[in-house]
Amino acid sequence: MPLTSAFRAVDNDPGIIVWRIEKMELALVPVSAHGNFYEGDCYVILSTRRVASLLSQDIHFWIGKDSSQDEQSCAAIYTTQLDDYLGGSPVQHREVQYHESDTFRGYFKQGIIYKQGGVASGMKHVETNTYDVKRLLHVKGKRNIRATEVEMSWDSFNRGDVFLLDLGKVIIQWNGPESNSGERLKAMLLAKDIRDRERGGRAKIGVIEGDKEAASPELMKVLQDTLGRRSIIKPTVPDEIIDQKQKSTIMLYHISDSAGQLAVTEVATRPLVQDLLNHDDCYILDQSGTKIYVWKGKGATKAEKQAAMSKALGFIKMKSYPSSTNVETVNDGAESAMFKQLFQKWSVKDQTMGLGKTFSIGKIAKVFQDKFDVTLLHTKPEVAAQERMVDDGNGKVEVWRIENLELVPVEYQWYGFFYGGDCYLVLYTYEVNGKPHHILYIWQGRHASQDELAASAYQAVEVDRQFDGAAVQVRVRMGTEPRHFMAIFKGKLVIFEGGTSRKGNAEPDPPVRLFQIHGNDKSNTKAVEVPAFASSLNSNDVFLLRTQAEHYLWYGKGSSGDERAMAKELASLLCDGSENTVAEGQEPAEFWDLLGGKTPYANDKRLQQEILDVQSRLFECSNKTGQFVVTEITDFTQDDLNPTDVMLLDTWDQVFLWIGAEANATEKESALATAQQYLHTHPSGRDPDTPILIIKQGFEPPIFTGWFLAWDPNIWSAGKTYEQLKEELGDAAAIMRITADMKNATLSLNSNDSEPKYYPIAVLLKNQNQELPEDVNPAKKENYLSEQDFVSVFGITRGQFAALPGWKQLQMKKEKGLF
């Protein structure tokens, strides 16, 4: 096939395009067959996404376990050619059967099916409405499932997985006694997907619970008629698990082949910084053998760039890693989110918008906090998410201090004063549409004892119980106060380095105290105590020097008028308005004497705000096996928040733990520890004090929902459980009738009776009270549209429609009058 013809299907529309290698040429795979892969073949997949206004593309070449070396080489060559065709910006991935990346598996929400054979044995990707099928599928996984065609025998079964017996017109799901509810639900959704995409919605599905086979005698008879007499089922086969700690070990290598041989030089290990990458070179980043990245600098030659994948394979061989090791090649300036998150920070020069504005007190770089319209926070949750604000901070506030491991109310006049030797709970209550919502901040001082830290976490759970677990819990380590926390105290937040505010404290105040005052309005201003030395000063901020006799408010030459006004207001709180204002460069000698003498400090010109280029990422977290495992959900939507799971949303400067209503007690209790372990094992060397917010299902604030497109607060009440879906599948008697017909030698599966029956659009637009044909299911009218009419009505193919979430399908059907 000519190259231009092969890539004619490429456009800028979001979605995926799949080609199979057939006789060393690219053949387009129909959308209805996406997610089906023959084990004897190789494939090339192009994924196109829009991130804001930018186009993001990934090219994967997939290697079946029985494919030939020639086919594998051909797929790699086409991947390189497609990359060139698209201007060299896509990220390239090498995928091997059974070892696919989370990104790849995420494209196929209903699962991946491995089919025996390949193009060499005459296997074709068939279109919809084919019933001449007889196979047994072994389904593994809970989040992104994989189904493999296995021998049609009871010997293929085990107690821990789910199996689908697919007989064309009938699909029977057998659930291993030790499989979990998530696996059973995903397998059922796969069975429904096969029914709807491949059988035009006309196959029947039955379910057998492996520990209650006697309750399904008719279905068991079908299984035994097909597979023979039931034998003893094998024990559970444990899944291969890669510990998150293993993923956290990373090494950066410089690679060259100038002497004709692959030369690898170790550059650095965790934590990595972006400046290590030279734009004229190529590098390999080794994630402990679990994944290999190749970074191609802009200045590298075309030959070096094209050889990137072969260099990675040579590196894998040199390291004696498995040949199935996942490989990703990235281009300088077009790096994937997965690659960038392996570095301590990833900045983009000349970028004016971005996420992750994280800075520490004392650094010369400044954050310019833009003012925003608070009325947008609930009408546009994406604004709340970007600003990290649920409202303007005008709700009700209650503050307690941990004292003798118990909660002691803080007097109102001391609200906003926090001491580094203490821990505090701050309960904030606000209303949305007349309904109260709660945020519980757990502020932990840098010098608080371990007992106090533990008590603050325990007491937070107790306070949360008063609201039936509806409060959002936010752990705040001293110095990492979120913007909303500062807004609560209206520009009057003061953080003392040590000491305590409890009564009877015998520790005297230091004779000299220096506070750095940061912020330009009441939503982002705080005073933080810093060491009382001249070296603590910064020309871009305002500082308050306080003694028992004199008070100086020092204006750095880079501070703005708004910053000075807010600092003066806060200083008057600490000094009763008796402070002397001093401009940088006009300090009296006494000022320097109080700071121990004049010494150099950060006085360079104001630096540009640094924009960290990070993307929000969603993970499923688990430590059920004794190993901490996180699985990323790519291109996530609200549908990916499973009520049986604990999910982690990482927005870099905040980490959200979302707890599903049906999550088990152990996972709920260990939620905070899970988030802390995630930060600790993150390969980039993340700040362990990153704020952690614990969110309960049904009580999500806009700072969380804003990270999801088109958040629907009613999605779970409208959603269906595994048992409800099972009830909808119909009775076993219908399956018995079909299987009896299938055994009848006079019945041809390709006869006119088995052909799908279609009706004109006008007929199907009638409601139930009108004259719908008797054989039309009013809840599934779309199944009776011809392929041409289906595209005409919905604007997409039947396969694309089947891949949509259930709520989206229902919405489209209502809009078109087909429900």
From Swiss-Prot:
InterPro entries: ADF-H/Gelsolin-like_dom_sf, Gelsolin-like_dom, Gelsolin-like_dom_sf, Villin/Gelsolin, Villin_headpiece, Villin_headpiece_dom_sf. Disulfide bonds: none annotated. The modification Phosphotyrosine is found at Y85, Y758. It is found in: Cytoplasm, Cytoskeleton; Cell projection, Lamellipodium; Cell junction, Focal adhesion; Cell projection, Neuron projection. GO terms for cellular component: actin cytoskeleton; actin filament; axon; cell projection; cytoplasm; focal adhesion; lamellipodium; neuron projection. It comes from the Eukaryota. Residues 753-819 form the HP domain. PROSITE patterns: HP. One of its GO terms (biological process) is regulation of diacylglycerol biosynthetic process. Gene3D superfamilies: Severin, Villin headpiece domain. Residues 628-819 are annotated as: Required for interaction with F-actin. One of its GO terms (molecular function) is Arp2/3 complex binding. A 1,2-diacyl-sn-glycero-3-phospho-(1D-myo-inositol-4,5-bisphosphate) binds at residues 109-116, 135-143. Ca(2+)-regulated actin-binding protein which plays an important role in actin bundling. May have a unique function in the morphogenesis of neuronal cells which form ganglia. Required for SREC1-mediated regulation of neurite-like outgrowth. Plays a role in regenerative sensory axon outgrowth and remodeling processes after peripheral injury in neonates. Involved in the formation of long fine actin-containing filopodia-like structures in fibroblast. Plays a role in ciliogenesis. Associates (via C-terminus) with F-actin. Interacts with SCARF1. Interacts with PLCE1. Interacts with ACTR2 and ACTR3; associates with the ARP2/3 complex. Belongs to the villin/gelsolin family. This is Advillin. The lineage of its organism: Eukaryota, Metazoa, Chordata, Craniata, Vertebrata. The gene is AVIL.
